[in-house]
Amino acid sequence: MYSSQASALPSRVIGLISGTSVDGIDAALVEITGTELDLKVELLAGKTYPYPAELRERILAVCAGEAISMLELADMDDAIALAFAQAAQNIQIGYQPVNLIGSHGQTVYHRPPKEAGVGKKTLGYTLQLGRGEMIAYLTGITTVSNFRVADIAVGGHGAPLVPRVDAFLLSHPHESRCIQNLGGIGNLAYIPARTDGWLSQIRGWDTGPSNSLLDLAVERLTAGAKTYDEDGQWAASGTPCYPLVEKWLTHEYFHLSPPKSTGRELFGVAYLNQCFQDAEPYQLSPADMLATLTELTVASIVHSYRTFLPQMPQRVFLCGGGSRNLYLKQRLQLALETIPVLTTDEAGVSADFKEAIAFAVLAHWRQLGIPGNLPTATGAPQEVLLGEIHQG
């Protein structure tokens, strides 16, 4: 149980996350009041702290399946925790005291649960590096970390975890909405209008690849000189190859019914290599290849909406790094026709730091004893408290 009196007091919380794009650590310092329907979050500061190049390369190699020793894994865990702690120390300058840190860490492995016969299920597994104990010690601030494992332990996917936060920050009394995150992997939260029973009707799942494939392709096409396509300008100069998009959409993941989750294990370097191999007969230019990969992201999102949502949303709000990709946004708007495609900035929540904000809120809820998962999104049979608390 939680104290309503304590929850009414403002709390300054830092949210930290590095997503599947491995661009760096997104840090958001927020002031939180309330809990759920009365939840109010003010962003005081937000910044992305790039990983050191050598550490980023090590993380990407592990995410791609490269085998490492336990010693190397331990060293990477410590290096990531140190980077997260430094981000927390930097973002709070001028805003002390800070009450709490919510640190997602860096996902290096994710395995969804699997059906193993009638009435049987093999539990999923997830590993986020950057241990909370070390962050709490280095910053002196109580830290909540390891958010996903509790949902997985009861049979859920441990993802997506953000839909419950989206529900209370971005829902509307009369309008159904999709909050579409365009990180390394795309994921959605479908939020119906706030009518009776609306919370039980929220849905969420990973739609498929987003920035991860595009960024990997840019690095490949430029021999590492560039890590992303700014504003999607390069892709915008190309022409999508629709037969390729149709071929790629036959991948079993896109036709798997939710709840579902994925990551670089499925849509990483090996998948991109196959995409390039598939494209060889078409003799695509680099711009055409990027345009076609962009179209895959768009097509997978629209396919998800039309196939698995109870109804199409009245508005779509984008967040994450891909929300700044103007070409991707334009293509998605074209595909969704009359449904307005906006960014969460236009609903009062930073599109750049929404995920970091969400983990600040999840940490706030954990400290107050409020469940953070939505079973309709993660597939868990019950609500659970998310995260492990490490005293600062």
Curated annotation (Swiss-Prot):
UniProt keyword ATP-binding, yes or no: yes
EC number: 2.7.1.170
Enzyme class: transferase
GO molecular function, one term: ATP binding
Sites where the protein binds ATP: G19, T20, S21, V22, D23, G24, I25, D26
Functional pathway: Amino-sugar metabolism; 1,6-anhydro-N-acetylmuramate degradation; Cell wall biogenesis; peptidoglycan recycling
Keywords: ATP-binding, Carbohydrate metabolism, Kinase, Nucleotide-binding, Transferase
Stored Pfam families: AnmK
Catalytic activity reported: 1,6-anhydro-N-acetyl-beta-muramate + ATP + H2O = N-acetyl-D-muramate 6-phosphate + ADP + H(+)
A single BP term in Gene Ontology: amino sugar metabolic process
InterPro entries for the chain: Anhydro_N_Ac-Mur_kinase, ATPase_NBD
SUPFAM superfamilies reported for this sequence: Actin-like ATPase domain
CDD domains referenced in this protein's UniProt entry, alphabetically: ASKHA_NBD_ANMK
Function recorded in the entry: Catalyzes the specific phosphorylation of 1,6-anhydro-N-acetylmuramic acid (anhMurNAc) with the simultaneous cleavage of the 1,6-anhydro ring, generating MurNAc-6-P. Is required for the utilization of anhMurNAc either imported from the medium or derived from its own cell wall murein, and thus plays a role in cell wall recycling.
UniProt record similarity statement: Belongs to the anhydro-N-acetylmuramic acid kinase family.
Cited HAMAP family: AnhMurNAc_kinase
Protein name: Anhydro-N-acetylmuramic acid kinase
Organism of provenance: Trichormus variabilis (strain ATCC 29413 / PCC 7937) (Anabaena variabilis)
